[in-house]
Amino acid sequence: MDKPLVIAGRSFQSRLLLGTGKFSSSEAMKRAIEASGSEVVTVALRRVELENPQDSILSAIDTSRYLLLPNTSGARDALEAVRLARLARAAGCEPWVKLEVTPDPHYLLPDPVETLKAAEILIKEGFIVLPYINADPILAKRLEDLGAATVMPLGSPIGSNRGIRTRDSIAIIIEKANVPVVVDAGLGAPSHAAEAMEMGADAVLVNTAIAVAGDPEAMAKAFRKGVEAGREAYLAGLGSTRATAEASSPLTGFLR
């Protein structure tokens, strides 16, 4: 039997985290969240008015059912990310933060140096930090040693829907990590989410692939099933791969 996902001592039954950007409406987002089965919903601090209960995004998220995870999307350096996280806590959010530092607006790749700086500051201030990083096993271990609650390596650039292009590095991170590994960014199809879970990732975070789908609600449900199938396959124990064929039926002793 599977165990729940545990992050910073808090248990979650779902291993699918959901982003809230790019949805056509707050109602479409709300339906997708429900269909996904997710219990963790991340919101960009630059896109919401935390002190406004009528904010179109915040008002669609029932915080009694979902952990609202603020993210520092758009921060270009450590100080900007720290400032955003502090604003969220001052506005009454729980001290959880998805840390994103992306100075390059074209590829949105995370800055490892500034991410490490911001993580160190925020962890010392009592934040539960979930850092978005390149699939760098050394950086992942450094962040874990600092006290990060998870590590969140990218599969491919944010919003690219290209799937897991960093498979070998993510496999090393999974092997070495003692905190949950959440594959984040670039997962464009339920099969990509299943692949991450089959590898042994603890969870995945998906946004664009669901939000821009023709039917976001149906796609959210498909990702939910993909995550569940991948996790079940991992727990069942996947067969080893081979360079040559191996018959599944005997090649001798045929009836004559």
UniProtKB/Swiss-Prot annotation:
GO terms for cellular component: cytoplasm. 1-deoxy-D-xylulose 5-phosphate binds at residues 159, 185-186, 207-208. The keyword Transferase applies. Gene3D superfamilies: Aldolase class I. Its EC number is 2.8.1.10. Keywords: Cytoplasm, Schiff base, Thiamine biosynthesis, Transferase. The keyword Cytoplasm applies. One of its GO terms (molecular function) is thiazole synthase activity. Catalyzes the rearrangement of 1-deoxy-D-xylulose 5-phosphate (DXP) to produce the thiazole phosphate moiety of thiamine. Sulfur is provided by the thiocarboxylate moiety of the carrier protein ThiS. In vitro, sulfur can be provided by H(2)S. HAMAP family: ThiG. This is Thiazole synthase.
